[in-house]
Design a protein with these regions (language model features):
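Residue-level detector of alpha-helical recognition elements and their boundaries
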Residues: 81, 141-142, 146, 258, ...
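Short Gly/aromatic-enriched secondary-structure transition segments
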Residues: 79-86, 218
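Structured, hydrophobic secondary-structure cores that serve as assembly/anchoring elements
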Residues: 60-65, 71, 84, 91-121, ...
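Alpha-helical scaffold segments that mediate packing/assembly in large oligomeric complexes
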Residues: 110-192, 206, 330-334
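Sequence/fold signature of self-assembling virion shell proteins
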Residues: 2-50, 55-73, 94-96, 114, ...
Length: 334
């Protein structure tokens, strides 16, 4: 639909619009709730990480102190013996909310009046999707290799050392014939660490999902969940793992000298345009492995002093930490 009111210069190229019911009567709480809901429907790490401390975050720079239950010792008993009492000391870890992402855009009253469909919904959906991509990529890039040494490499398994989960120099070549076997080996590695069977997850890339669907055994064990939100990447279960598919897993070119690249390409980008990505990360773990806290701390509007319209801006702060490395495993695939 052509503009009824003429739009010139930078306004035609850059000014955006919103619904009239929100122009001049902006309600921050309404917008904040909407964005948070859409973000967590789309975020892999909102699903697989421990978010128990989410409500304690109020601003960037906050510190959340996490107490981990100590291990209670079990001793032999003989009749008449004096008991030795243990003094349990919780292990305290510090989660720093030191990351922040924002968006800011301009809404023009005249363009909003002509806009169809509802632009607030459209902008909120796009902001949530872009936030998902940025935060998911950042979190997974900085945690994917944070598991225990016994949970990765060519001799994985804290007790058996018998599972080849790949290395930078020698990634595992996945095929339709062996992909399920490697997933079962990831499960065994977690079993050897006594990781609980519930709340386990597996995060794979689309190429690995394709290999899974080419495996007859995988198809027999793979159960879709028609009621799950599509945009969180959840596609089914395999051997106690809830399986998620995402494009945000790190990748790297062949060889140990080349850096890993974040899923969105924003971190450690390879400068050579001729690099061929030959390594990819596949992550398995338990919900307790990574603590992740995110909060939309600012959502506000300011009237544009130079035009009829509003400036809308929002700040999302977050932090993450691998708190149980024994509950996180890594497969380096090719």
């Amino acid at each position: 639909m052509p503009a009824i009111f003429p739009v010139t210069g930078a306004q035609a190229a850059g000014n955006l619009a919103t619904t009239s019911s929100y122009s001049g009567t902006f309600i921050p709480a309404v917008w904040s709730a909407k964005l948070a809901e859409k973000f967590y429907a789309a975020s892999v790490y909102g699903e697989i990480a421990n978010t128990s401390w989410q409500g304690e975050v109020s601003s960037m720079g906050d510190k959340v102190y996490i107490n981990t239950a100590p291990t209670i010792q079990i001793a032999n008993y003989q009749a008449g013996m004096n008991l030795t009492y243990q003094v349990p000391t919780p292990d305290m870890q510090e989660l720093v909310i030191d990351k922040g992402r924002y968006f800011a855009f301009q809404i023009n009253d005249v363009l909003e009046y002509q806009a169809k469909p509802n632009l607030m919904d459209m902008f909120a959906a796009d902001a949530a999707e872009q936030m998902r991509i940025a935060i998911d990529s950042n979190v997974v890039y900085n945690t994917f290799s944070g598991g225990a040494a016994a949970n990765k490499g060519a001799t994985a398994g804290v007790k058996s050392s018998s599972y080849n989960l790949g290395t930078d120099a020698a990634p595992v070549a996945l095929t339709g014939a062996n992909v399920l076997t490697k997933i079962l080996e990831l499960a065994s590695v977690l079993d050897e660490q006594n990781v609980p069977e519930s709340d386990r997850y597996l995060v794979i890339d689309p190429a690995t999902r394709t290999l899974l669907m080419q495996s007859n055994l995988a198809q027999a064990q793979f159960m879709g969940d028609a009621t799950s939100p599509v945009r969180n990447g959840k596609i089914g279960t395999i051997d106690r793992f809830t399986v998620y598919v995402t494009n945000q897993l790190p990748k790297a070119a062949a060889g140990t000298a080349t850096p890993w690249i974040s899923g969105d390409g924003a971190e450690n980008t390879v400068t050579s345009t001729g690099s061929v990505l030959k390594r990819r990360a596949i992550i398995a773990g338990h919900k307790s492995a990574i603590t992740f806290a995110s909060q939309i701390t600012k959502m506000e509007t300011v009237r544009n002093p130079n035009d009829f319209g509003d400036f809308i801006r929002s700040l999302n702060v977050y932090g993450f930490k691998v708190v149980k490395p024994e509950s996180l495993a890594l497969l380096i695939a090719a």
